[in-house]
């Protein structure tokens, strides 16, 4: 079993409060879950209303499949209309 993880850092220029941030983050997480079948959570910068750090995970039987799915998530976020893409870290591990 392979677990792929993706950590994405986004800048939310239009966010004026944590409430604004939560609304944007919720929409991003829901869309990525629905489109790519990944698990999603906000994992860092929880109190900063301008920055969102999101974690995504996928379980697969092949490293290449897990990596492909997460790269598609990253690509989708790079073109998000509200959030500016700041960077990502992609990793995978084998679990016996």
Indicate where each model-derived feature is located:
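A structural signal for short, well-ordered beta-strand segments
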Residues: 6-10, 54-56, 88-92
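Short, charge-patterned binding micro-sites
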Residues: 3, 41-62, 94-95
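N-terminal first-folded block
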Residues: 1-39, 76
């Amino acid at each position: 079993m392979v677990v792929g993880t993706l950590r994405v850092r986004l800048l939310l220029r239009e966010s004026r409060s944590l409430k604004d941030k939560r609304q944007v983050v919720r929409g991003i997480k829901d869309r990525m879950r629905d489109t790519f079948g990944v698990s999603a959570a906000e994992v860092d910068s929880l109190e900063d209303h301008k920055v969102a750090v999101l974690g995504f995970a996928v379980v697969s039987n092949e490293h290449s499949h897990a990596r492909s799915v997460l790269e598609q998530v990253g690509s989708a976020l790079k073109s998000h209309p509200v959030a500016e893409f700041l960077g990502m870290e992609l990793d995978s591990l084998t679990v016996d």
